[in-house]
C-alpha cells in the first residue's frame, strides 16, 4: 500500500522493472537490530532493511522504498557474515532474473530466507513505499 495516498500498489507498479546491468549498486542493505538469544532461548531475531538506490527509485517512479524484514532464526552466525551472504544471494537471484522490480526483490528475499538459508522459522515483512504523485 502506498503510504502517501493510501491506495494499493497496482500490478503494473509492482512488476515494472529495470535491467540489472543498467544500474550499479541498486540496493542498500543494513541490519537495524539484532537480538541475540533473548531470554536464554536458542533463537535469534534479526531486523534488517533493504533500501532502493536513488537511480533505481528514479527509474521505477518511486519516491521512497524501505523494505523491513524481521527474521526469527536459529542461525548462530555473526551478523556481518549473515548480511554479506544474504546480500550476495539476493544479488545472485536478481542477476539470474535480469530485472529488478519490487516484486522480484521480495521474491529474492523469500527465496534466500526459506530455500538457501536453513533454520529460518518466521519472517515478518513491513514496507514503507511511496510512489511519485506526478
UniProtKB/Swiss-Prot annotation:
Stored InterPro entries: Gemini_AL3
Similarity field: Belongs to the geminiviridae replication enhancer protein family.
Provenance organism: Tomato yellow leaf curl Sardinia virus (isolate Spain-1) (TYLCSV)
Biological role: Increases viral DNA accumulation. Enhances infectivity and symptom expression.
Description of how the protein assembles with itself and partners: Homooligomer. Interacts with the replication-associated protein (REP). Interacts with host proliferating cell nuclear antigen (PCNA). Interacts with host retinoblastoma-related protein 1 (RBR1), and may thereby deregulate the host cell cycle. Oligomerization and interaction with PCNA are necessary for optimal replication enhancement.
Protein name: Replication enhancer protein
One GO term of the biological process aspect: viral process
UniProt keyword Metal-binding present: no
Alphabetic keyword roster: Host-virus interaction
Repeat as UniProt keyword: no
Amino acid at each position: 500500500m502506498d503510504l502517501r495516498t493510501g491506495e494499493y500498489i497496482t500490478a503494473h507498479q509492482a512488476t515494472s522493472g529495470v535491467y540489472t546491468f543498467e544500474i550499479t549498486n541498486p540496493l542498500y542493505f543494513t541490519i537495524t537490530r539484532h537480538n541475540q538469544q533473548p531470554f536464554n532461548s536458542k533463537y535469534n531475531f534479526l531486523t534488517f532493511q533493504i533500501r532502493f538506490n536513488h537511480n533505481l527509485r528514479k527509474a521505477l517512479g518511486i519516491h521512497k522504498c524501505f523494505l523491513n524484514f524481521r527474521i526469527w532464526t536459529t542461525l548462530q552466525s555473526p551478523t556481518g557474515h549473515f548480511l554479506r551472504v544474504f546480500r550476495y544471494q539476493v544479488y545472485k537471484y536478481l542477476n539470474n532474473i535480469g530485472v529488478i522490480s519490487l516484486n522480484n526483490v521480495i521474491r529474492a528475499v523469500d527465496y534466500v530466507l526459506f530455500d538457501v538459508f536453513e533454520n529460518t522459522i518466521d519472517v515478518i515483512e513491513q514496507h514503507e513505499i511511496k510512489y511519485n504523485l506526478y
